[in-house]
Structures are given as structure tokens and as C-alpha cells.
């Protein structure tokens, strides 16, 4: 058996940071990007010897894989007055990858070409995720009494698209077999949560906390399969 393989990979990245401080406002942000691209070629030869019969399978293939990832987030704090503070924290994530492959295979028996198979495929995936948090808090006394309203929100979606095509030709009986398939998957959803927190100070450095929370989630998914000759 003999297998040779060679490939080339390229990588790239980028990062940006920003910081601002004003009298009552603080702002922080960060953006990060990472991407890769790999190209790979392969060749395989398999020799099988059984009694007086000999069979050889030869195949060549090419694969390419690309990935892209991006993350961006920020932080904002605004001291509206001496006892009231607003905080906002958003984040965004996205990712995408593409895979492409193709191959050609021949089967030989006793130096006679028996079959040929040509196949190709693609696979694309993409997704994103968004989250946001906002909190408004207010101090009601110097002893630790305070109240806060916090809202969280999130949204996400992803999709997958796969396609596989193959054609096999059998020379002995001169027939052909075709197999084609496409698969699609889609998922999306969102959620949010609202919280109201009240803190009451007690003697001897103890605190009593009251919390009300409401949360909602919704998700949807679809799956499709297509086959044709």
C-alpha cells in the first residue's frame, strides 16, 4: 500500500482594542478575527493479492477547508449621578467554514480496468450568536440598600448545507450508478430574561435580598434532505 499526501495551510488574524474614559463614562471594546485556509492533495494505491488474482485500487483526492471566526464585545458604564449606574455589555460571535473535496478512483483486476468512481462534495456551515446585558442600579442608602433592574437578551442562528455527488461506472456489464444528495439544516432561536433585585441591609452586616426573575426561550429547527439521480 502506498499513500502520499501534501498540503498548504495559511493563517491570518487581526485584533483591535479600544479604551475610553470620560468623567462619568467608561468604554471598553475588543474585536478579534482568526481565519485559516488549508489545501490538501492525496494519492493512494492499494495492492491486494489473493491466490492467483491481483487487484489494484488507485485514487486521487483534493480537499480544501476554510475557517473564519469573528468575536466582538464591548463594555459601557455610565454613572448617571452619584447613586445611579447604567451598565451595557453586548457581544457578537460569528463563524463560517467551507469544505470542498473531490476524488477519482479506479479499480483494476488482473490488469483489467473494472470500475471508475468520481465523487465530489461541499459542506458549508455558518453561525452567529448575539448577547446583550443591560443593568440599571441605584443606591438607596449608604448602609447597602439598593435596587437593580437587569435585562439579558440573546439571539442565535446556524445553517448547514451539505452536498455529495458520485458517479460509478462498471465496465464489465457497462452500467452506471449515480448517487446525489443534498442536506440542509437550519436552527435559530432567541431568549430573554428580566430580573429585579432589591437588597435590604440588616444588623450585624447581614443583608436580605429579594429577587424576581422572568425568562423566555424560543427555538426553531428545520431539516431537509434531497436525493436525485
Identify the role of each PLM range.
Residues 44-53, 103-112, 164-173, 225-229:
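Flexible, surface-exposed loop regions and adjacent strand-edge segments
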Residues 5-8, 65-66, 112-115, 126-130, ...:
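A short linear-motif detector with a strong N-terminal bias
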Amino acid at each position: 500500500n502506498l499513500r502520499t499526501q501534501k498540503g498548504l495551510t495559511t493563517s491570518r488574524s487581526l485584533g483591535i482594542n479600544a479604551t475610553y474614559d470620560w468623567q462619568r463614562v467608561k468604554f471598553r471594546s475588543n474585536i478579534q478575527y482568526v481565519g485559516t485556509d488549508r489545501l490538501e492533495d492525496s494519492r493512494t494505491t492499494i495492492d491486494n493479492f489473493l491466490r492467483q488474482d491481483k487487484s489494484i485500487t488507485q485514487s486521487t483526492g483534493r480537499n480544501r477547508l476554510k475557517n473564519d471566526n469573528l468575536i466582538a464585545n464591548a463594555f459601557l458604564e455610565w454613572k448617571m449621578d452619584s447613586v445611579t449606574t447604567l451598565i451595557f455589555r453586548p457581544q457578537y460571535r460569528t463563524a463560517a467554514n467551507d469544505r470542498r473535496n473531490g476524488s477519482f478512483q479506479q479499480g483494476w483486476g488482473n490488469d483489467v480496468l473494472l470500475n471508475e468512481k468520481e465523487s465530489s462534495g461541499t459542506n458549508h456551515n455558518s453561525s452567529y450568536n448575539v448577547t446583550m446585558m443591560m443593568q440599571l442600579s441605584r443606591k438607596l442608602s449608604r448602609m447597602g440598600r439598593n435596587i437593580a433592574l437587569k435585562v439579558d437578551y440573546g439571539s442565535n442562528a446556524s445553517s448547514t448545507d451539505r452536498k455529495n455527488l458520485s458517479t460509478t461506472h462498471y465496465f464489465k456489464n457497462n452500467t452506471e450508478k449515480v448517487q446525489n444528495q443534498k442536506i440542509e439544516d437550519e436552527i435559530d432561536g432567541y431568549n430573554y430574561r428580566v430580573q429585579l433585585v432589591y437588597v435590604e441591609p440588616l444588623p450585624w452586616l447581614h443583608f436580605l435580598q429579594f429577587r424576581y426573575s422572568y425568562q423566555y426561550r424560543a427555538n426553531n429547527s428545520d431539516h431537509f434532505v434531497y436525493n436525485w439521480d
